[in-house]
Every structure is written in structure tokens, then in C-alpha cells.
Amino acid sequence: MKTIAFIALFIIISVPAVSLAEGPPPLTLEEAVKTALVHNRPLLSEGEKLKASEAGVGEAASAFLPKANVSETFVRSDNPVTVFGSKLNQGNFQASDFAIDKLNSPSPINDFNFRVQVIQPLFNGGKELIGYRRAKLALESAKMTHERARMETAYETVQAYWGVALAGEYIKTAKQAEKSTEKHVNLAQDLYGQGMLLRSEVLLAKVHLADVEEMLIKAENREATAKAALNMILGRPQDTPVTIADSLAYAPFPGSLESLQGEALKDRPDLKGMKYNVENTGEGVRMAQTDYLPDINLIGQYDRDSRDFFGHGGDSYTLMGRLTWNVFDGFLTTNKVREARANRNAASYMYDQMKEGALFEVRKAYNDLQEAKKRMDVESAAVKEGRESLRIITERFGAGMAKSLDVIDADTALTRARTNYAAALYDYNVAEAALRLAIGEKY
């Protein structure tokens, strides 16, 4: 008996643990956003672009440093000048090589030239410094783009999360309608059995029940699709089980339109990023103008020539300074400067347009928020009235004072009011998220 009691106790204790292990814990909105900011694939892509911009700064900085090259060159020739020079370079020139026949018709010679060359830029019109500044500006712009991508990912997560919640509300509404319609069908059948109702009234009630069941099927499919969409944004397999913890609710959003628009102009990272781009195009004008100036480089070179590969022979060094000045290039530089100035002006116009666009986005989201709140108030009252209307008409139907169609109309109106209220509540929460995105609020 003790063994049986122990087994029974073990089963009782274990069953809840097993049931809890069957599915993941409910997902809160905050957890969903945090997950998306870590695993969302488009956001990860933006992160790699940011790394590329960071590498671009290092790439630009390398222009300040010397460049070193090592080479090994093989030449076999019987050209008199080449043979003469190669013998000198190899330190292998003999007095007999001055013989006229050897000078004019020398035997072929092998020459392996090992060379180390170092080039140090001294002045190239400021290309190195301007290129470095442009890379730094591009990095700052990339940081702002990445920050904006984080905000957009958070917004998409909120929208998808509330999409799951809305689908759940639709399922709840459909089940409520199904329950009330089933009661109506049963009542209609009872009245028909008592001879108080026509068969057509019963059939009409059953048709309405079929419509409600179809609505439930669509709502369940909508929920499955919404969960797959949420999983995709979270960077998870689309068939990952999802249970959300938070429900659609109303919370007032503080701030006037004017103050919110001011926040957008001050805080939005995409505007800051575009401002960096405008500065970068200004540097582009200065970069184009550097072609008017000379290039000065210092070159150091070490050579070793021998008859064999990496063999021992004559060696030498060379130091030189090189100045190159393109005094006329067919107006190429002039047109490059014109192009750069046009790009700078275009970026400036785009920056102004982006600011106007940001103000409009705030205005639209703000108006959508106000509209959704008004719809919520209207539909909330409609739900209360619809519920009372259905109760009254159902009682009248049971007393033989109303038709089946009256009950169906009342039930349909209540279902529509419940659906509209859920949609308005969803629109309010999404509009709030859109407003936070529009003003540049960080998550």
C-alpha cells in the first residue's frame, strides 16, 4: 500500500511539471522587443553594415601610412643595353666586356631583381585628411542608420505582437457569438417543437450559426498567420509556439502635437544621419578640388640583382622625391567639382525634405491616435447598447413577440461592435508605437 501511495503521489506532483514543460511561458511585449533587437535578421544585416563603416575608417587612415612592396623580377635578354646594365647591377662587369663585339652582340644574360620599395605620401592636396574625415562622417551616419533600424524593428515587433492580440480578440468575439447563436438555435427548435415558430425561422438561425462558425475559422487562421509573422520578426522559426502575456489596453499618451514634432526634429537618428551625409557631400567638394593641387611623395628603394633566384649579387638603394602636377586634364577636375557641388545641394534638399517628412509622420501618427481613441469611445458604448439590445430581443423572441431575424440582427450588431472596439484598441496601440517611432524614442 505504501508503494502504491508513493506512486500516486509522484504522479500527482509530476503532472503539473510535465504540463508546464509542454509549451514556452507567455511572451511579454518587452521580452518580444528585446528578442527582436538581438535576433532580427534585417537588423543583424544593418549591424554588419555598421561594421563595414568602422572598417572604412581604418581603411581611410591607412592613406597616412607608408606603403611597402616586395618584388622579384626575372629577365633574360641579349639586348646590349639590358645586358650591360644587368652586369653592372649584379657587380659582375669585367674589363673584357668593353670589347666592341661583346658590347654590340652580347651573350644572353639572366637577371633576378629583388626589390623592396617604400612610398610615403607627403602631400596629395589633402586627399588623405579629407578621405579620413569622410570615412568618419560615413561611420556616424551608419550609426544613426543602425539606431533607426533598431527603432523600426521595435515598432514592427509591437505591431506584430498586437496583431496576435487582435486575432485573439477576434476569436473571443467569434466564440461569444457562437455561444449566443447556439442558444438561439436551441430556443428556436424548442419553440418550433411547440408549434410556436415556423421551420424557416429555425433554418434562418442555423444559417446564422454557420456564418458565425466561418467567422471563427477565419479568426483562428488570422491568429496563426499573426503568430508566424511575429516569429519571423523575432528571428525564430515561424512554427514556434507563441503565447502572449499582454493584452490590448488603453493608456493615454502625453504631449501636444507641437512638442512631439519638436522632439522628432531633435532626436530622430535618421535626421542626424542625413545631416552627416550633407556634411560628407561637402567634404566631397573639397576632395574633388584636391586634383587642382600637386602630389608629392617620398620613395625609398632597395635592389639586389643576381644571376640566380634570390642569389647573391650586386645591391643598391635609391631615394627620390616625386612631384606630380596635372596642369591640364581636359576640364575633368572642373566637372568633378561641379558634380560634387550638385551632389551636396541635392543632399541638402533631401535633408530639408526629410525634416518635413518627419513632421508629417508625427502629425499622422498623432491624428491616428486621436481617431482611434474616439472610435474606442464610440464602440465601447455600442457594445454596451448591443449587449442590452440582444438581451431584450432574445426575451421577446422567447415570448413569441419577436422574429428570429430580429435576434440575428441584434447578435450581428453586437458582434460587429465588439469587433470594431477590438480593432480600434489595436489601432490605438499601433498608432502609439508609430508615434514613438516618429519622434525618435529609443527602446
Set out the residue ranges of the language-model regions.
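Acidic, low-complexity, intrinsically disordered peripheral segments
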Residues: 6, 20-22, 76-78, 420-443
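Periplasmic alpha-helical coiled-coil/stalk elements that build and connect Gram-negative outer-membrane
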Residues: 27, 146-263, 365-368, 372
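Amphipathic alpha-helical coiled-coil segments
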Residues: 45-60, 149, 153-172, 183, ...
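Bacterial N-terminal signal peptides
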Residues: 7-16
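Small/polar (Gly/Ser/Thr/Ala-rich) solvent-exposed segments
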Residues: 44, 67-82, 103-109, 119-148, ...
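Bacterial Sec-pathway N-terminal export signals of envelope proteins
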Residues: 20-73, 79-80, 121, 238, ...
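Transmembrane beta-barrel architecture of outer-membrane proteins
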Residues: 111-113, 159, 204, 259, ...
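Residues on the lipid-exposed face of transmembrane beta-strands in outer-membrane beta-barrel proteins
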Residues: 116-120, 230, 321-325, 424
